[in-house]
Amino acid sequence: MKKIFLGLMISIGLALVSSLIVPNSYQSVNAEQGVQELSAKDFEQIKELYARYNQGSDFRDTELFLSAFADDAVMTREGGDIVGMDGLRADRARRYEGKTGDVGRRHINGSYLITPTPDGAEARTYYLLMDVTVRPPNVISSGYYEDKFVRTDAGWKIKHRTLYRDTLD
C-alpha cells in the first residue's frame, strides 16, 4: 500500500512540475521567436470569423461575409486567387446572381487548430457543407481551410484563406 501511495505522490508531483515547466518553456520559445501567445478572447474572435464567413455565404449576406476578411485579403481555391475586397465582393455578386436570403446550405466547421505566428495567427479547420433543402440534410462537400489571420484596428481578420476540398481521387 505504501508503494502505491508513494507512486501516486510521485506521479502527482511530476504532473505538477511539468504543468509549470511546459507553459513557461512554450512562452520563452514564442518570446524568442517574436510570437505572442493568443488569449482566450483572441481564440473566440478568430473563431467568430468562421461564423461570419459561413453565415454570410449561407444567407447571401455580402457585408457579413466580407467582414471576416482584411482589406487586402486573398482567398485561394480551385480556379485561382481572389484578391482584395473588390475581388471578394465581385465573387460574391457572381455567386449570388442577384439573389438574397437563405441559399439552403450550411457550412459547419470543427477541429480548429489555431496557433500564434509572428504576424498574427494561423489555423487549419475542417468544414462540411450541407444541403438543408432535402430530408434528411446531406453533406455535399467537405474539406479544410488553411488560414492566416492578422489583428487590425477592427479586430482579427482573415489575411489569406486557402480552401482544400476533399476528393475521392
Name each region found by the language model.
Residues 26-28, 32, 122, 142-169:
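Short beta-strand edge/turn micro-motifs at domain boundaries
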Residues 62-127:
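A solvent-exposed, acidic/Ser-Thr-rich amphipathic alpha-helical stretch
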Residues 107-109, 140-145:
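Short, surface-exposed coil-to-beta transition loops
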